[in-house]
C-alpha cells in the first residue's frame, strides 16, 4: 500500500473513502433536463445534504477516514503546473468550441481553485457570463439552452468514475454523456494531489478507453478475483480489456468474472442488484436470476494464447468456488415477495456498503431487506435516505473506497 491505495476485497475493514457532498449542481436540475441528467425527480438539496452528512458521520463513527472529492480536487488544482490544460480538457468535453471555449476558459480562470472546481461541478449558466456578440450559427441556434457547462448532479455517486483494484485504479470511461467529465476530477487528484502524486499508481484502465466501464459494476471478491457486471453501463469488451490489463500487470489477480445482468435503468450496475456483506454472504435481487437460480457468468483467465473464457450458468456455485468455500448465502433483497423485492431494489435495498466483514451501511427505507440482513447475522447501520435515494443510488454508490484492511 505504498502508493496510498489498497483494495483487496469488498468487505475488509474500510479505512479511507472518497465522497462528494451534494451541492449546487443539484439545484441546476430542471424538469426539462431531468432525463438527460439521469434523474427521475428534483431532490430537495437542504435535506439531501443533511442525509449525506448523517451518512458521513456514520462512517466516521466507525473510524473511517472520509475524504471529499471537491476538497481534494481544489487542492490538486493548486499543485497542477498548468490549470489551463485541465480547464481546456473539461471545456472541450462539454462540447464548447472556438470562441465560446476561450470565453468560458478566461472566465473560469478568474476564480481561485475552490470556486473554479465548484463551478465546474455545479455547471456554468450562460446568464453568469456577460453578454457577448455571437458570431457562429451554432451559437445562435443554441441560444435557448441555459448552460455553457452542464451541471454534474450524479457526482455524489463517487463509486462510478473510478475504482481501486489492489494498489491500482481504473479511471473510467463513463457510458452516459452526462457523466463523462466526472472521471477528470479523479485523474486530476491522482496526478497532482500530494497525497497520491509522489508515488506511481498503476492505471488498469483509463478514461480514454474505447468502451465504457463503471465502478458500480466492479466488485473485488478477494485479492485474486474481480467480478464485473456487464450491464446497461459497462460493455463486455471493456471487461475483456480490463482482464488483459490485470493479467499482464497485476500478478495477484488470477481471474475476472463477468456477470451478465439485464440492461435496464433499474439494474444499471451490478451493485444495484448484488453486493457482498460477509465472507460468504451476499445480498441479491432475485429478479436477475431465472427460476432455477441461474445467471450467465463468464470466467476469464490467463492462458498461453491470451484469454481463456469459460461460460457458466451456476452463478452461486461459481462464487463459492472462487471464494474457496463449500457454499455461499444469497440474501434476497426485499425477501420472496415480488412486489416488496422490486420496490426495495428500486430504492437501493441491495446496494449495501460493507465497512467490515458482516457489517454494512444501508438506507433506512428498505426495512424488509434490512431485517433479513440482521436475521442472517449482519450488523446493519441504517442511514436516512428520502432525498439521497432520488438519484437512484445507495450507500455503496456514494463511496469510492481508497483503502481497506486485508482479510486474513
Curated annotation (Swiss-Prot):
Pathway: Amino-acid degradation; L-arginine degradation via ADI pathway; carbamoyl phosphate from L-arginine: step 1/2. It is found in: Cytoplasm. The active site is at residue 397. Its main location: cytoplasm. Keywords: Arginine metabolism, Cytoplasm, Hydrolase. Its EC number is 3.5.3.6. Coiled coil: none annotated. The keyword Hydrolase applies. GO terms for cellular component: cytoplasm. GO terms for biological process: arginine catabolic process to ornithine; arginine deiminase pathway. It catalyses: L-arginine + H2O = L-citrulline + NH4(+). One of its GO terms (molecular function) is arginine deiminase activity. Gene3D superfamilies: Arginine deiminase, L-arginine/glycine Amidinotransferase, Chain A. Belongs to the arginine deiminase family. This is Arginine deiminase. The gene is arcA.
Amino acid at each position: 500500500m505504498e502508493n496510498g491505495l489498497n483494495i483487496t476485497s469488498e468487505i475488509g475493514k474500510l479505512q479511507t473513502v472518497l465522497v462528494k457532498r451534494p451541492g449546487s449542481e443539484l439545484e441546476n436540475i430542471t424538469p426539462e433536463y431531468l432525463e438527460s441528467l439521469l434523474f427521475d425527480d428534483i431532490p430537495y438539496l437542504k435535506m439531501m445534504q443533511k442525509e449525506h452528512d448523517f451518512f458521513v458521520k456514520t462512517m466516521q463513527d466507525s473510524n473511517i477516514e472520509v475524504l471529499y472529492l471537491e476538497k481534494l480536487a481544489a487542492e490538486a488544482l493548486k499543485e497542477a503546473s498548468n490549470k489551463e490544460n485541465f480547464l481546456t480538457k473539461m471545456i472541450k468535453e462539454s462540447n464548447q468550441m472556438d470562441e465560446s471555449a476561450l470565453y468560458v476558459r478566461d472566465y473560469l480562470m478568474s476564480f481561485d481553485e475552490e470556486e473554479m472546481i465548484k463551478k465546474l461541478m455545479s455547471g456554468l449558466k450562460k446568464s453568469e457570463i456577460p453578454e457577448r456578440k455571437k458570431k457562429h450559427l451554432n451559437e445562435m441556434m443554441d441560444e435557448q439552452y441555459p448552460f455553457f457547462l452542464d451541471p454534474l448532479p450524479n457526482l455524489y455517486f463517487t463509486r462510478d468514475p473510478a475504482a481501486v483494484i489492489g494498489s491500482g485504479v481504473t479511471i473510467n470511461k463513463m457510458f452516459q454523456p452526462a457523466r463523462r467529465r466526472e472521471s477528470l476530477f479523479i485523474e486530476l487528484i491522482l496526478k497532482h494531489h500530494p497525497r497520491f502524486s509522489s508515488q506511481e499508481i498503476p492505471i488498469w484502465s483509463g478514461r480514454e478507453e474505447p468502451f465504457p466501464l463503471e465502478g458500480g459494476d466492479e466488485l473485488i471478491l478477494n485479492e485474486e478475483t474481480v467480478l464485473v457486471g456487464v450491464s446497461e453501463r459497462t460493455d463486455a469488451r471493456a471487461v475483456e480489456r480490463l482482464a488483459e490489463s490485470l493479467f499482464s500487470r497485476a500478478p495477484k489477480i488470477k481471474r475476472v468474472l463477468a456477470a451478465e445482468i439485464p440492461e435496464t435503468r433499474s439494474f444499471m450496475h451490478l451493485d444495484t442488484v448484488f453486493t457482498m456483506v460477509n465472507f460468504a454472504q451476499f445480498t441479491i435481487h432475485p429478479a436477475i436470476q431465472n427460476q432455477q437460480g441461474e445467471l450467465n457468468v463468464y470466467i476469464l483467465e490467463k492462458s498461453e494464447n491470451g484469454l481463456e473464457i469459460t461460460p457458466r450458468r451456476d452463478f452461486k456455485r461459481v462464487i463459492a468456488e472462487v471464494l474457496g468455500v463449500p457454499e455461499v448465502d444469497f440474501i434476497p433483497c426485499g425477501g420472496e415477495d415480488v412486489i416488496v423485492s422490486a420496490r426495495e431494489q428500486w430504492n437501493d435495498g441491495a446496494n449495501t456498503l460493507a465497512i467490515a466483514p458482516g457489517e454494512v451501511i444501508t438506507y433506512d427505507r428498505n426495512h424488509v431487506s434490512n431485517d433479513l440482513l440482521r436475521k442472517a447475522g449482519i450488523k446493519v447501520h441504517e442511514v436516512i435516505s428520502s432525498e439521497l435515494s432520488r438519484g437512484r443510488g445507495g450507500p455503496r454508490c456514494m463511496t469510492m473506497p481508497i483503502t481497506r484492511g486485508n482479510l486474513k
